[in-house]
């Protein structure tokens, strides 16, 4: 099959939609083409001459796309499975690449011996067992790119598993996907701090069935302390829609710890270009959402939740954003088509929602 500018040999039996299932000996999920598109786009915005490690490369689809579509990269496509490495080697040969090499190692041993400018960790399920090794393998000032597909724990459907795996209390309901993303980022921040390292998010998002974050690693105890200082907790009352955050845990703020800093580096996003990708239309749509969303406001509102609370029909979200921007700042969020963020307080927002509802016209 062809993805972006790259030809990829994949198993005949593979996942096409949704959270993939392991079928056969080597995993491949067509729906993750968007994830791979974003990796290519982001890497093109980094400095040239980047060394890349794809820690769990499977077929090597991400690795060979990066090697072929991002100039100046040197890529190591690693997988512990010999069957996977056979696919990687075939894909390197298929695309005539001299800047991509295969590696058949346990990723923990690979990163104990080698370090890279960009480390990609995209496991089947949770990244938690592998995060420390990925951090070891990331050079000073490098970038960690980490995926989590265990959305049920992170989004609160399996809260006990989230507590055990991420040492965090998840939130259910319409905030669940932003909450899950911020729990993942909090978990990585705490692991980085063990190495006297901090992080600056370049891009973080929820899409399809997974969470994904790209983090610039910052060195030193001050960076670690600064990062830990951006972790905190959420209070939310579903009856009143009131929410607040706190940087120290207390009985009033049960959800977290969460990353409370920005999800993206807006200056970095401004330089990203969605050209020559597998699904340019979708990447462009998300890139515009990421660039415009108000990620300094920590949690989203949802049109359906406001409608239910107010017992009013919801207005069209685009028109409502225009209306709200006459009173403050507001923009749609990427986490769902009906979600948005605003710096307008809840006490101000509810009367404005009532005023703009079709039922009030």
Model-predicted segments: where are they?
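SAM-dependent transferase fold signal centered on methyltransferase-like domains
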Residues: 1-361
